[in-house]
Amino acid sequence: PLVDGLSDFLQSKGIKTFGPSQAAAQLEGSKTFSKDFFIKYGIPTAGYSSFDDFETAKAHLEVVDYPTVVKADGLAAGKGVIICGNKDEASEALKNIFQDQTFGEAGNRVVIEDFLQGEEASFIAVVSKDKIVPLATSQDHKAVGEGDVGLNTGGMGAYSPAPIVDARMHQKILDEVMEPTMKGLINEGSPYLGFLYAGVMIHNGELKVLEFNCRFGDPETQPILLRLKSSLVQLCLYAIDNKLELYESEWDKRHSCGVVIASEGYPEKYLSNQEVEFQELHSDSMKLFHAGTTLENNKVMTSGGRVFCATALGANLKEAQTAAYTLVHSVSFNGAFCRTDIGYKGIK
């Protein structure tokens, strides 16, 4: 909706709106736009080339190093990124995107980019033109399988804070990524308002931007919000009025962990319309976030690939992880599955 101009439309009707303009939302809406923007404003990112036809893209596969990364240019529900170990896999990815149109119009153009080594982290902030309030750091798990293997998904779980983003790295991301992005968008005539999510790869103390999202991430939002003690609504209102300096962030010092409960088959064709059963757990430090569910005849039914995010707080990440899986086990439906290692990078 943001890429389609929802924020612009609401503001044109005099409605207070928290969210970037159609022009600014291109940071997420087009990977080619975002990569070109990174280069223009000196924001560190992987080397890349973009293509709008199959044959030219396929010819480029002869000159890239493997593994390489093939990305659908547009919005693809978090599934448009394919890591390819060799030329055959990359060629198949291009065929799926261009010829089979797996991602529809999002695949009218592709970006082929260098594969980056390192550890990913999510850096989410509220931005209002030239002002910024960083939120708690987090790390998600995109691959469907334990140990980060298998197909990419929208995210199978997340935890907060992310130990890899220490104080030095936090400042480095602000200085090298967020500040240049804010200033660059102002320079482009599209000052930013809303959540700005930078997915970064960190390796040997250096960073590169993988992607931008113009929204809270899912499933990072759930563990982050479980730790936020100050008002999210007030934060958004201050951003709309360009008064972020008045906001005082307050965070729970505990760690949080969120585990996605998914439907059998996800991230490909998945089982749906299954009745969900719950065992009651009463705890202020746990929260079951619904995602792919509907209510039919007073019964909760599954309706999506990612169905719930079981999220919990703990004195440390291990305790938060244990509590989150306790909550996972209180939910059951036919075909339910989850990764059993969410948070492992932060516990190692």
Please tell me what each predicted stretch does.
Residues P1-G29, G42-F51:
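A short, GP-enriched loop/loop-strand-helix hinge that lies immediately N-terminal to
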Residues Q26-T32, G145-E146:
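Short, charged, surface-exposed secondary-structure boundary motifs
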Residues L174-L196, N213-S285, E296:
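Active-site "cap" helix and flanking loop/linker of ATP-utilizing ligase/carboxylase catalytic domains
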Residues T17-P20, G47-S50, T68-A72, I83, ...:
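General beta-strand structural signal in soluble alpha/beta enzymes
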Residues D65-N86, I224:
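Conserved anion/nucleotide-ligand pocket segment
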Residues G80-T221:
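Internal nucleotide-binding/catalytic subdomain
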Residues T293-N297, T302-K348:
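Generic C-terminus detector
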